[in-house]
Amino acid sequence: MVNSEQALHQHDPAPILQLDKVSKSFGPVNVINQVSIDVRPGRVLALLGENGAGKSTLIKMMSGVYQPDGGQILVDGKPTTLPDTKTAESFGIATIHQELNLVPTMTVAENVMLGRTPRKWGLVNFKHLRRQAQAALDLIGVDVDLNAQVGSLGIARQQMVEIAKALSMNARILILDEPTAALTGREIDQLFKVVDQLKEKGVAMVFISHHLDEIARIGDTVSVLRDGQFIAELPADTDEDELVRLMVGRSIENQYPRSAPEIGQPLLEVKNLNAEGRFTDISLTVRAGEVVGLAGLVGAGRTEVVRSIAGVDKVDSGEVIVAGKKLRGGDISEAIKNGIGHIPEDRKAQGLVLGSSVEDNLGLATLASTARAGLVDRSGQHKRAAEVAEKLRIRMASLKQPISDLSGGNQQKAVFGRWVLAGSNVLLLDEPTRGVDVGAKVEIYNIINEMTEKGGAVLMVSSELPEVLGMADRILVMSGGRIAGELPAKGTTQDDVMALAVSQVDDSITEEAAAEIENTKEDR
């Protein structure tokens, strides 16, 4: 009798990379437990799981960064040891990370051939270098100026350079780790065209994404992990609700569980805020118990407004008032002292100190205010951090663990925890669920609910319109650096939001913004 996995692959070629019952532990923590994965030529295997499920550890074993404690890795059916990334590359295994491995000050051609520069008589043979780099770019059909500095390119183009670099090393297996995280809809379309081309050439691919629609669109099969365990391998077009159930171990009945707290007095008031070249005449109010969404296209000025309210950036004129008190502009410590907490759009670059512990990151906003006689109250800080970490269910080995070791969802909960610890009653959220899985998103929404139920106020920027419509009470829509209008979340459609979002946009609309408009049309 043919089992379901055999039926799934009965017409597929034999795998070129296999993980056979591999396990991996870090100290007492068992991260991967007897997981088996097959990667096949000309196929895309999507790897799905919550943050912390073990996806990153698994791909690091595939690429030679980690070695399994148990089980074995097979390449072309033969047991193989991958002690380092160079060995993995020699077998044709290449990884495209979220943080691209390129040198910004070097040219496209030099980056494609990085570490393998052709030489003649001891000197770089630039003619040969450009020829080889062009051949690699031709494989994916991308037209990029070979002499352009990589740092001058957008993220999508840099990603194509990274893929070309992998192919120039004769990669047979491409591991794509969250490749769409920083891309617009149009750029994602271009990436997926390249993936389709590579499939036709017989390249095997492992694709990691939190976006279930992308998995159905580009994957052939999907392997689901949960808590380091292999749960199932299924066709990539499996119903999304079923994938979520397998991934989190339960059904999520309400993806946007907005509570209905009593709306109180204004907590945050912004009056006639202006910053030349960024935004004009911004006025808004957020009341106690309320979530106000801030929507708009890329470049509309949403992030700039939030940063200015938080005191990160200075403004030319206008007022920010919290609980009746006018704040000094451009003063972060003043904003924090008066109850403002800011969660930036890029948590790794702006929201965390990656080299520090979970405990230190949780306490960043309160170290000074809780000091005694000028000395940090380490004991008290540890106790408070432990309470917040438990309350927010931050998954970690200990408070002393480097925050860089945590999954994206747990890192984001730690940033929230910092402001819970600080007692902030006004939260400014910029893309609060970017790069986190479905289960972690719901946990973050519940944190937002709990804060508003206690009388807090939330101003939330999000590029995901379903999130704005599902979690906000009111929606302010920005267009061309101005607030173009206000909509009640109840009964409002994505069409309604987009109509306001493009109302002030002129002929200089960015490519990213145009892509957002097209994507919204497609979603409908």
UniProtKB/Swiss-Prot annotation:
Outline the extent of the ABC transporter domain: 17-252, 263-505
The record's annotation in Pfam families points to: ABC_tran (PF00005)
Gene Ontology molecular function? ABC-type D-ribose transporter activity; ATP binding; ATP hydrolysis activity
- Gene3D superfamilies assigned: P-loop containing nucleotide triphosphate hydrolases (3.40.50.300)
Q: What is its EC number?
A: 7.5.2.7
Role noted for this protein: Part of the ABC transporter complex RbsABC involved in ribose import. Responsible for energy coupling to the transport system.
Q: What's this protein's name?
A: Ribose import ATP-binding protein RbsA
